[in-house]
Regions:
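Conserved, structured core segments of small domains
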Residues: 1-112
Length: 112
């Protein structure tokens, strides 16, 4: 959450520490978000989910992850003007992230 607040002030998001280590900003398609949260951010508080206009990103590449799925990776900073919406992801009583209404149809894992 703090990283995003800083990005909004500067106009540029350079990614999380994990993104910087990997050399790109990790993205997920809408239907991949629930699994990404479960796998990489279990019970993590103060998360912000960004909805981005991917058509305006020049350095976005789709690459295969270790689970075999294709994920978008941004090999540049993210200009905040390409962020269409932002959602806080509070935790429910079980420590599961509450999805915004737009993503609730994806709250179950997708078939592979």
């Amino acid at each position: 959450k703090e990283e995003w607040q800083t990005a909004k002030q500067t106009g540029i998001y350079n990614g999380s520490d994990n993104d910087k280590k990997d050399g790109y900003i990790h993205f997920s398609e809408e239907d991949q978000v629930p699994e990404t949260l479960k796998s990489h951010y279990p019970k993590k508080e103060n998360l912000i989910l960004l909805r981005v206009n991917a058509f305006k990103l020049e350095h976005l590449l789709w690459e295969q992850a270790s689970n075999g799925d294709m994920y978008p990776h941004l090999y540049s900073s993210l200009d905040v003007k390409n962020v269409v919406d932002e959602f806080e992801l509070p935790l429910d009583n079980d420590g599961i992230h509450e999805l915004p209404e737009i993503l609730k149809k994806y709250q179950f894992s997708r078939p592979r």
